[in-house]
């Protein structure tokens, strides 16, 4: 199949996927889009939102529609790396046998990732980066495709272990999950307080997802789009010669080269899902906020003057 035909097929599958997901999830269009873009782009996602906004349900629903295995890990202060990676046990033959942990799954929901100590966070982040884990000196590859969706609660920050910048950088997207609108909440309450059950169809499988991930990397990009993405990221760096006034006034730390890479991959995927065979600058802009918002560090002045991260990114674009 030619790449053009494959993109057309991806568009059809994407629409079918969204229809299936919306049988269960009411609203949250942007969140669903961004999670699907990160899956097809071979990235990982950090969902930030207060409890009860269907973050877990969303991941569960997506894994059903994609026909992938799914595990949920609830991160707590006493969780150890071996609890998520797995450990060696002595079997009845008196031999050591590796017992796989919950990380060995296609989709892993890391719930409240900031509630666990750095030691356990780093075990998860090694898995995200290397797509394999190390236990008792042996390396074990994780199932492919492998996708981590971590959640974080923006309130109740006491007793948490905030993710350092280097670890946040591993996430392709930082997705804000907002409260539903009045009409959406009406629909949610109506659907969840009755005894109706929804059966979901499997739209694509793991092999097709990996084919689509390869397809997206093959999509060509014009030099002006590439230049726009790299320049946008460079504008976030305070000591860059082209840094605008807003960067010097409100940003302490800018984004690294990984942001430029993700902007291009995200733009390619956004273009493909919308039936375009090559991304333009609008596609870069469409994915800029979730890619940049966790890679920039605001200073005290920005916080004091109420300059949100999204507002700064908008002005930079």
Task: Give residue ranges: language-model regions.
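Conserved C-terminal "switch" segment of AAA+ ATPases
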Residues: 7-11, 24, 174-246, 273-277, ...
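Short glycine-rich substrate-engagement loop in P-loop NTPases that contacts/grips substrate
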Residues: 77-106
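Conserved AAA+/SF3 P-loop NTPase catalytic/coupling segment centered on the Walker-B
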Residues: 82, 104-129, 143, 158-167, ...
